[in-house]
A protein has these predicted regions:
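Single, function-defining residue in the core of a domain
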Residues: 1-27, 31, 60-61, 68-77, ...
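Short edge-strand/loop segments of extracellular domains
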Residues: 35
Length: 243
């Protein structure tokens, strides 16, 4: 019964399924029942695992319980890796922000619209590069553009946020600037930028082509981001210019 199946039992069952690559509720049930005499030592306090009980718990219990638990575990783990080297001479906190699309069956997941023939969700993750620990995880349907999730971030002053050009929204990037944080992203090919001055670069020892400070020149873009921007161009191993 669900009432005899605690949230901790549910967590252990789903963690077991994830770590051992179980493919269905029946698969979870069969494998855990095969280890019935070891369940107590694994942390379970229920006497047996039923796929119906697990299915009901997954369907009816609020997901916020496990979201809060995940945040608690993350808060415990982050200090353990805070001093882990990044491979660059930078003491600040560095985050990478990106989204992954996970395809789903449309008939089983009609609540996750994506295309006419299939469903999907997007997993938006802010990764602390000290230890590669996620500090923010947000799930949306597949149609949600990743740039919208920037509004949900709790920005940290002095931190660096690394993003691809899918997050190039100047009004939202200016919010990061106003929070006294920093962002690094790719410029789009049609970005209009006027150089004010250039910083010296050593092309003989680095792949940096230029390091410039300037402003946006398109009317609406300059209104969205009125502060100066830094633009750095580098050459990759194939000789391609990246800005």
């Amino acid at each position: 019964k669900v009432k005899d199946f605690s949230c901790l039992d549910q967590f252990f069952a789903m963690a077991f399924a994830q770590l051992t690559y179980r493919e269905s509720l029946r698969d979870i049930e069969v494998n855990l029942r095969a280890q019935a005499n070891r369940l107590y030592h694994m942390g379970f306090r229920c006497s047996t695992i039923s796929r119906n009980t697990l299915a009901n718990a997954n369907a009816t219990r609020p997901w916020q319980i496990y979201a809060d638990f995940a945040q608690h575990l993350i808060a415990m783990a982050r200090p353990l890796y805070a001093k882990e080297p990044l491979g660059i001479d930078l003491d600040a906190v560095v985050y990478a922000f990106d989204a992954s699309t996970i395809d789903l069956c449309l008939s089983l997941h009609p609540w996750a619209p994506f295309r006419s023939t299939k469903a999907a969700i997007k997993l938006h993750t802010l990764l602390d590069l000290h230890g590669s620990i996620p500090s923010f995880i947000h799930i949306t349907d597949g149609k949600t553009h990743e740039v919208n999730v920037l509004d949900d971030l709790v920005l940290e002053a002095g931190a660096f946020y690394l993003m691809d050009r899918g997050y190039l929204d100047f009004s939202r990037l200016y919010v990061i600037h106003q929070a006294q944080a920093f962002f690094v992203t790719r410029a789009k090919s049609n970005t209009q930028f006027r150089r004010r001055y250039s910083n010296p670069v050593d092309r003989s020892t680095t792949s940096v082509i230029c390091d410039q400070t300037g402003v946006l020149t398109v009317f609406y873009s300059s209104k969205d981001y009125p502060a100066p921007l830094r633009r750095v161009a580098v050459k990759d191993e194939t000789g391609k210019r990246i800005t």
